[in-house]
Regions:
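Conserved PLP-enzyme active-site core in the AAT-like
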Residues: 1-193
């Protein structure tokens, strides 16, 4: 949507580095209405329009204040894009928060997308680290593009260990963070109605 992190906060990287043309739809606090992205999907349009190859969704929505996307809405978009051969990517940097807030399994979110990115530092407390998930073929291609962009790292075992620790020991504590955030928001609302 128009407030998506990949559009607002990445300095136009998709266009600058990859020549990608992006289109976006309006939303209320980032909440997904399946009609939004589907109104922009174009396939089989000949040589005069750009065909849609990817729909990107964000969960939770950063600039929407942490809006959690309903799994039903995500499934509806997937059911519409899949027959058209349009891939889906989840910017799931904060997916852990959606999982904890809704009880929806991480795998239930993941199975709706061709690729998913998650961040190990946002919410989980790892010092750094993001992970891209997808099929073996897509990950092989992603490794090639990572190398082309000069994004490889060496000696990352210590960072991987921190990420594994965060997954094993911090995910279940996110509900405590949610409770503290709700108390803080309530106190702010009471202090400044």
């Amino acid at each position: 949507d128009q407030q998506a992190h990949v559009l607002r906060a990445e300095l136009g990287a998709a266009a600058a580095f990859s020549g990608i043309t992006s289109r976006s739809w309006p939303s209320e606090r980032g909440l997904l209405d399946p009609a939004g992205p589907m109104s922009l999907v174009t396939t089989g349009v000949g040589p005069y329009q750009v065909e849609t190859s990817l729909v990107v969704l964000e969960n939770t929505h950063n600039f929407g204040g942490g809006t959690v996307q309903p799994i039903e809405a995500i499934r509806e978009v997937r059911a519409s894009t899949q027959p058209l051969g349009v891939a889906m990517h989840l910017d799931g940097a904060r997916l852990w928060n959606a999982h904890v807030a809704t009880g929806v399994a991480l795998s239930a979110y993941g199975e709706q997308f061709d690729t998913v990115s998650v961040c190990l530092s946002k919410g989980l407390g790892a010092p750094v680290g993001s992970v891209l998930l997808g099929s073996a073929d897509r990950m092989a291609e992603a490794r090639i593009w990572r190398k082309r962009y000069g994004a490889g790292m060496r000696q990352v075992g210590i960072l991987a260990a921190a990420g594994i620790h965060a997954l094993d020991h911090h995910l279940h504590r996110l509900s405590d963070d949610h409770a503290r955030a709700a108390r803080f928001a309530a106190a702010c609302a009471e202090a400044a109605p």
